[in-house]
Structures are given as structure tokens and as C-alpha cells.
């Protein structure tokens, strides 16, 4: 799937995002599984998953460049190739990143395809890819750290969030299967515990992105930086789990995170969510800190709708109405459809991009699909 398109769908770059082969594969297969068994949706999902099979690094053994899903169906995450981040049109390698998010998005695509097609190879590939991702979190030798751990060891919330969401999707499509020695539900518990104990700072009213090894706040630009949209996405992952389990404690945790990060992120002057903030309200070094990106608003629409559904509290109805109205007024393109991705603080368009290596059919359709299910 191409994602680098201009406002009217004109192709801007034929390079392909491996993230979006997984994300789009999951989205279209999920629509097929939950909304309508439209053969076109399954065809798109199949195309994305077939392409994913070609996006791994070469491996030095007799099986050569065999499809990733075939390898995973036998190896269960052990000694399997790492997926690229970007590839050329024909899947030739371009860029490999240090982290393993391509693998997590591949896992959810394989899981949704397993449910749609009942092909066991996809079931096993989904389990194997999640195992690869979990190994990257738990074994520090697997993923290169962003900063030298000898000088400043840190931990990030991102892998725990994505592990939680990935385990939720595998459980939804495959059942509560065992992955790397634990059930999906047990991994979800582990992720929520890490987020609650290490990253949520109630005394500061924030969910941190990066902390020290013992959960301490480190007083530097990169480690003081908050991402309200990311934190609000985490909040609804937890609220989603609370709804499945009818768990009041999890619901409170999700609501607490949503409440404090909404306060941190919502722009009282122009509306919309700031991209970055500082834990101590100091200046942020990234020059795009006050811009409005499409995806945090999609996550906030889900989070506020879910909070309203779970509690009936009119506060969340007002928050939902505010972010929904602002988003559809400023991001939506009434002529060509879809959403623009990047706005200045006051809501003016930064450019006309509809898609890129980072923006594709995931956050917006997931928001529309999830809210329609509530």
C-alpha cells in the first residue's frame, strides 16, 4: 500500500511504509471481520499482508528469504528476521530502525487475517511477531537504546503501550492465547502495571513518556517532554480493558490519565491539542511543539467518547464535543475527503499532505470504526 499522497490522492513518493502494511492490513481485515464481509476489504488486507512477508532483513540460513509468516509459523519469534521501517516500491530495503514497531503492527495484521481467513499460518505468525516484540522490550540487547545507557539509562512508555494494544488485538482475534510464556491478558496486566507504577505521576498530574530506570523524572529536555495525545491514547487502551473486564480500578486509572493529560494538552486559546508540553511547563525544544497533528485528535475523540460511555459524566460529553468539533472543522477536507495531517497552532494548514511514511489509513479510520462500535 502506498501512503505518500497529496491532497487529491496524487502520489508523492512510491516508497512504502512497513508500519502501514501492518496497520492497513489490520484495519481492512478488522472491517471485514466486524462490519461487513466485503471482499474488496479482504483483498486489500491480503495485499498488505502478502507485501509484509517480503519486508524483512535477509537471514543467513538455508531458508533464505522465505516469507516471514512461514518462518514465524515454525519459529515462534526465535531467530526470525527483523522487519524494515521503509522499503522501495518492490520491497527492496531502505531503512531499518532500532525499535520493533513494524513487528507489532505486523502482529495485529496477521491476527486479524487469521480470523478473516482461518489460515493457521497467520495465527502462528501473529503469535510469533508479538513474541519478537516482547523480546525486544524485555531483552535490552535486542533494541539499541536512544541514549548511551552508561551515561543516562532511561525507559520509555511507548513499547509498553504498544505491547498492551497488540495483546488486546491478538486476544480479540485469536482468543487469550499464550505468547512467550504468558496469556495475552497476563501481558496486558504487566503492561498496565508498568505504566501505572513507573510512568504515571499523580503528584505532578502527568503521564511521562520517558523516565529513569526506577521511574524517576529526569530534568532534561528529552525526558521532561510530554506528549498529551500519546498519553490520551494510552488512557483509552486502559479504559477499553476496563470495559472488557468491568474493572472499576482500571476505569479510574484510565480516567485519571485522560483528565490530567487533557488539562496539559488542550489549547485554551485556539482549541485543539498541543503536540508536546513540558512536565514543569518549561519551554520545549522541538520547534513543532505547538502544532496540531491529526492523530492525537483521533485518539482524544475515542478516549472522550469511551469515557462518556462508561461513566455517563457530562464532563466527558463536553470534552468529546469540543475535540470532535475542532477536529472536523480544521482537519477534514470537504472537497477531496480524508484529513490533513499537520496544522499550525491556530488551525491553519501547514501543508496539503494527506499521507506520508508516518500518516496512512490507521488513526482516522480506527477512530471512526471504534466510535461506531460504542
Q: What name fits each language-model region?
A:
Residues 1-374:
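Glycan-recognition and catalytic cores of secretory/periplasmic carbohydrate-active enzymes
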Amino acid at each position: 500500500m502506498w501512503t505518500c499522497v497529496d491532497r487529491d490522492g496524487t502520489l508523492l513518493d512510491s516508497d512504502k511504509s512497513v508500519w502501514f502494511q501492518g496497520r492497513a492490513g489490520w484495519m481492512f481485515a478488522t472491517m471485514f471481520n466486524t462490519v461487513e464481509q466485503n471482499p474488496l476489504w479482504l483483498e486489500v488486507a491480503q495485499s498488505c499482508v502478502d507485501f509484509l512477508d517480503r519486508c524483512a532483513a535477509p537471514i543467513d540460513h538455508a531458508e533464505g528469504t522465505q516469507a516471514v509468516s512461514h518462518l514465524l509459523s515454525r519459529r515462534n519469534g526465535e531467530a526470525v528476521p527483523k522487519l524494515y521501517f521503509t522499503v522501495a516500491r518492490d520491497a527492496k530495503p531502505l531503512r531499518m530502525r532500532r525499535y520493533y514497531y513494524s513487528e507489532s503492527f505486523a502482529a495485529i495484521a496477521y491476527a486479524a487475517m487469521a480470523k478473516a481467513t482461518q489460515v493457521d499460518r497467520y495465527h502462528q505468525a501473529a503469535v510469533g511477531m508479538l513474541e519478537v516484540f516482547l523480546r525486544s522490550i524485555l531483552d535490552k540487547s535486542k533494541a539499541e537504546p536512544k541514549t548511551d545507557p552508561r551515561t543516562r539509562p532511561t525507559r520509555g512508555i511507548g513499547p509498553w503501550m504498544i505491547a498492551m494494544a497488540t495483546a488486546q488485538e491478538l486476544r480479540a482475534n485469536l482468543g487469550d492465547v499464550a505468547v512467550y510464556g504468558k496469556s495475552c491478558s497476563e501481558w496486558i496486566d504487566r503492561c498496565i502495571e508498568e505504566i501505572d507504577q513507573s510512568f504515571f505521576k499523580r503528584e505532578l498530574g502527568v503521564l511521562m513518556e520517558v523516565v529513569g530506570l526506577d521511574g524517576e523524572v529526569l530534568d532534561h529536555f528529552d525526558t521532561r517532554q510530554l506528549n498529551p495525545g500519546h498519553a490520551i491514547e494510552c488512557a483509552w487502551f486502559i479504559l477499553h480493558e476496563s470495559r472488557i473486564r468491568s474493572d472499576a480500578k482500571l476505569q479510574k486509572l484510565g480516567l485519571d490519565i485522560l483528565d490530567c493529560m487533557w488539562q496539559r494538552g488542550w489549547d485554551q486559546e485556539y482549541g485543539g491539542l498541543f503536540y508536546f508540553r513540558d512536565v514543569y511547563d518549561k519551554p520545549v525544544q522541538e520547534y513543532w511543539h505547538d502544532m496540531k497533528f491529526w492523530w492525537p485528535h483521533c485518539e482524544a475523540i475515542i478516549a472522550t467518547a469511551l469515557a462518556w460511555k462508561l461513566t455517563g459524566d457530562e464532563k466527558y460529553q463536553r470534552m468529546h464535543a469540543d475535540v470532535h468539533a475542532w477536529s472536523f472543522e480544521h482537519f477534514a477536507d470537504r472537497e477531496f475527503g480524508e484529513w490533513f495531517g499537520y496544522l499550525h497552532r491556530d488551525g491553519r494548514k501547514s501543508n496539503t499532505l494527506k499521507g506520508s511514511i508516518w500518516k496512512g489509513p490507521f488513526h482516522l479510520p480506527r477512530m471512526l470504526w471504534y466510535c461506531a462500535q460504542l
